[in-house]
Amino acid sequence: MAIFVNEVSRTFGEYLLIPGLTTRQCTPQNVSLTTPLVRFARSQEPRISLNIPFVSAIMQSVSNDTLAIELARNGGLSFIYGSQPIAEQAEMVRRVKKFKAGFVSSDSNIRPDATLRDVLALRARMGHSTIGVTEDGSPNGRLLGIVTSRDYRIGTTPEDALVKDFMTPFSKLKVGRLGISLKEANNIIWEHKLNTLPIIDENDNLVYLVFRKDYDAHKDNPVELSNKATKELLVGAGINTRDYAERVPALIEAGADVLCIDSSDGYSEWQYDTLRWIREKYGDKVLVGAGNVVDEEGFRYLAEAGADFIKVGIGGGSICITREQKGIGRGQATAIIDVAQARDKYFEETGIYVPICSDGGLVHDYHMTLAIAMGADFLMMGRYFARFDESPTRKLKIGNNIVKEYWGEGSNRAQNWQRYDSGGSEALKFEEGVDSYVPYAGKLKDNLAQTLGKMKATMCSCGAITLPELQQKAKITLVSSTSIVEGGAHDVILKDRG
């Protein structure tokens, strides 16, 4: 006979936090948002911790290399989407790793026998005024010089003038050698009043550029998520349960720091087999998350299979219609509460802490703090990040509104790839996601600062300055529909903000 769970399945919108004692120590500047990303044993430290509890969703319309770089610079982590050819996904991972937190791989390069006309065309296309002149015009060719806007005058320098005749030649350049630290590179820039410092290898091949303008940008990102030894930004990548034997090695070779199996329903033998294959081939060297699940059984199944973190949530995403199409899922708040208890129980029994990620169901910023208070270690978000300049989709004007495209991995547009199947050979015949728009919001950094500011303020109101302390001290109450209305502006005529 079927098992009936009589507990009501609830969402974040049905709860509020009750204030706790705010001590003098509880100020936003004292709040730490550090949280574990992957499993660790009692009394040990996790191999990777996030500096903010946010990761971006494994989606075509969200997580490419551009967003991954910006999110890592602000303390979070992106999982590059896997619904693309293996080589293209691996190349996105490489581009993030090459960024190296202040060291920029040059994507505007030219040959010495090109003309000023070519320089102007390249500048118009790429938007960069600093162009590396290499022997073969490639990003990592032998460096012969640099061209900037100070090397020519439009209207005076002939457009057919050869680059080699007006560039700043290698002999007059200040350069840094590969292996130099960012601090050392910045010291050279400031000492010699440079705007750009090329970094070259032992054969004089161009490897990176370091820009003066990035010095302040780097200072503005004190929570940057990077490898302390190499200074490379951290990045994740999504995998599936079909081509993992080919995809995983390519992503590891490209430098991915952590992987995640991407599926709407992770409680399956297909995920178990994928996890076991990775463990048998790589041992514990490769970090990999799994999911999604919504109860203790699903959590324990994946934890025992070797998952380094587990995603929680089925059907709660803004573009996900799995519940509508298949009738499976669970209210996100109830799922998090249940799985968090399962995680803590597993930790007591085994001494192994397996972090959980809340994926979906976050409508308002305060829902993020609620999800953490209920037990989530970190949050995966798609719609939130899709709104920003750095997401890979087009910015459009529809009527009087500026929007960005946003579609689910279960939509026809994402071609379903290998995500929403059951692991067999039969192709999926229906959608589990929609194609939509989200309001354009501007730059990631600006919006993230506001969101994190709200989270820190809420934590202080609860008397907590760390995420574990919030989970210990939080008092959470169910609210009625009328009290939700009471919590907003009511019984007044609002002024037009336009």
Enumerate the language-model features and the residues they cover.
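Active-site-adjacent beta->alpha loops and helix N-cap segments on the catalytic face
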Residues: Q84-R94, N140, G155-D160, S181-K183, ...
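Catalytic cores of alpha/beta
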Residues: T66-I69, Y244-A254, V288, V293-V312, ...
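Surface-exposed amphipathic alpha-helices with a cationic face
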Residues: S43-R47, A72, K97, L120-A124, ...
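Alpha/beta catalytic cores of nucleotide-metabolism and tRNA/nucleoside-modifying enzymes
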Residues: M1-L21, S108-R111, G176-R177, K183-N187, ...
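Catalytic beta/alpha-barrel core
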Residues: F79-Q84, N109-I110, T130-T134, V175-R177, ...
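Short beta-strand/loop segments at the ligand-binding rim of alpha/beta enzyme cores
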Residues: R47-S56, G102-D107, F170, K228-G238, ...
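Glycine-rich phosphate-binding active-site loops on the catalytic face of alpha/beta enzymes
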Residues: R73-E88, A256-S268, D308-K326, L362-L396
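Bateman/CBS regulatory modules and CBS-like beta-alpha motifs in cytosolic regions of diverse proteins
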Residues: T27-L50, A57-M59, E88-H128, V133-D136, ...
